[in-house]
Amino acid sequence: MSRRTAIIAGSRTPFVRSGTVFKDLTAIDLGVLAVRELMDRSGVRGEDVDHLVYGTVVHDPHAPNIAREVGLATLPKTVPAVTVSRACATANQSIADAANLIERGYADVVVAGGSESLTHIPITIKQALAEKLIGASKAKTLGARLGTLAKIR
């Protein structure tokens, strides 16, 4: 049997151009700000939250489970958190997954959302370039460093 669900509150950070106002904030930082504001606005206490569903499209290789990171910073550590990713619709997928948890009786209160920081996207490079950059960083003299960098094509 399906239960009815309701969205009781929402919050968000403003859209800003990459590399500007929020340049020092990661997707996790933005998520923490939004969830804290959500909890304040809604009056829901952390101990009343049964689950956190949170996502991002461009995952930080240093913190690939954004939901757990945001959850640990905003909710009791006993609240399970799952990370979702769906290109251009991650927050919507998080909300749909949260509604499903409630409808199916697995949870009563779920926090759902997503955040992104295009200022902090991981940039991958070819192995040959990586080796040259590492070689340049290990060079003992400026001349050796420049010589290594000059080989980049």
Model regions: which residues?
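Short glycine-rich phosphate-binding loop at a beta-alpha junction
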Residues: 48-55, 111
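Acyl-thioester C-C bond-transforming condensing/cleaving domain
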Residues: 2-3, 17-46, 60-153
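Short polar catalytic/cofactor-binding loops
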Residues: 10-15
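Conserved PLP-binding active-site segment in aminotransferase class I/II-type PLP enzymes
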Residues: 1-9
